[in-house]
């Protein structure tokens, strides 16, 4: 039923169930997420994910197979948290600039967004000084740069922008078509900039859509230096990161907008291996059989109505 389908989607969003993890990256490549959030971000703090703190963020990324994660909260820095195991927490911040969100990767400390949120000059000023003032690499985040600055990406690059997101797992950022994605990659390649895929995770859901493989030889011998080495690698441009994206519903697909939830489920199934699809079927049919058995038992217990005689 439609209600059952809605409950299935809600459960998938809210339940931090076991998830698919990336494995087999090798000793000389780190699996990295370049954009994620905790409950110090305004759009996490006031939601059902209000308990999604740094530890919960790291635990989510650990289950997904990440070695390092940049915690990039909105216009603020999450408290320091000690962790003895992977993934390594890397520093960063997401600045709400003028009609754009710019992710700064590096130990920026807090950033006053006001001078950068007023106009185009403020936005370009942010990417100009991201290195000198904040010792960070600047990344244009989806969907804002596509929606608001598509015709002047060259100008952002000329001002000093270091990289672009080409995959963002946030539902609102899934509209980037393959054509636009390829245009961004071509621009980055010409200008010597890097491109990344990001979870932009806010605590919802339990399956990563994208991973980044960054070549960092023998990084496990000195994990404390991993964040610095990842940032240094980004300076080598497009070839510095290999983006791995799961099969999903694309913006240019033929699915009608009203059927988007159904299309998401269908395309998810299409991208599964046989073993994963079988696991889904076992769970679905197992739950259905349990519910059916309970219904039968209830019907057996209820006595038949007594006939009345005059």
Please annotate each region the language model reported:
Residues 1-24, 190-194, 199-310:
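C-terminal functional module detector
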């Amino acid at each position: 039923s439609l209600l059952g389908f809605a409950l299935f989607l809600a459960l998938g969003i809210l339940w931090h169930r076991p998830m698919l993890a990336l494995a087999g990256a090798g000793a000389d490549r780190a699996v990295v997420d370049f954009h994620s959030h905790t409950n110090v971000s305004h759009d996490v703090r006031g939601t059902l994910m209000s308990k999604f703190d740094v530890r919960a963020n790291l635990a989510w990324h650990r289950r997904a197979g990440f070695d390092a994660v940049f915690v990039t909260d909105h216009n603020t820095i999450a408290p320091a948290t000690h962790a003895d195991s992977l993934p390594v927490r890397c520093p960063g911040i997401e600045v709400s600039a003028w009609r754009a969100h710019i992710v700064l990767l590096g130990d920026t400390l807090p950033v006053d967004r006001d001078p950068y949120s007023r106009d185009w000059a403020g936005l370009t000023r942010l990417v100009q000084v991201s290195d000198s003032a904040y010792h960070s690499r600047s990344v244009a985040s989806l969907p804002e740069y596509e929606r608001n600055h598509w015709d002047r990406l060259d100008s952002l690059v000329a001002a000093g922008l270091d990289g672009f997101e080409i995959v963002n797992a946030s539902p609102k950022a899934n509209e980037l078509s393959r054509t636009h994605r390829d245009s961004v990659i071509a621009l980055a390649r010409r200008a010597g900039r890097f491109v990344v895929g990001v979870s932009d995770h806010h605590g919802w859901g339990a399956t990563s859509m994208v991973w980044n493989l960054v070549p960092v030889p023998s990084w496990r011998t000195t994990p404390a230096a991993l964040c610095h080495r990842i940032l240094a690698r980004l300076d080598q441009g497009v070839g510095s990161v290999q983006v791995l994206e799961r099969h999903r519903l694309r913006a240019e697909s033929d699915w009608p907008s009203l059927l988007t939830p159904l299309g998401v489920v269908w395309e998810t199934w299409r991208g599964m291996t046989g073993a994963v699809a079988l696991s889904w079927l076992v769970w679905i049919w197992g739950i259905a059989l349990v519910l059916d058995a309970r219904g039968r038992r209830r019907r057996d217990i209820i006595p038949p109505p007594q006939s009345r005689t005059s």
